[in-house]
């Protein structure tokens, strides 16, 4: 379990950092994945130090989410400084963006094969260590940048997800990935 929260300006000081870090500790989270306007605790020196100390002492990594163009990672003010202070103990996360979620029955396939291909390339070619798995979209959804995500419809058959994960495992295992 990797707990996530969303930071908001004006509500992200020492108390918030302390409370969130307690949740990370409770679940022994292997990594910290930020979400929101700024890094956890960023509004106070003490809050920033609490996050740094937690990452150093727990051995948890800082999760860096890959941008949708796959060129860099999404960062917040203070990310580079945080990575420096924890000796670059970070991992790259592949986010299953809407256009990837929408690749069911795509390119001549009849199921999630192209989504599996995207996961495989992220792991093998771009060194992503975590896949941020999301629901698979039905093929006819509008995933343009201004699409209304509340209108999206999803594949709900568990067999599609099982196939996707088992096929990925089968492709990665001979290469030494577990």
Where are these regions (language model features)?
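Soluble extramembrane regions of membrane proteins in the secretory/endomembrane system
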Residues: 1-178
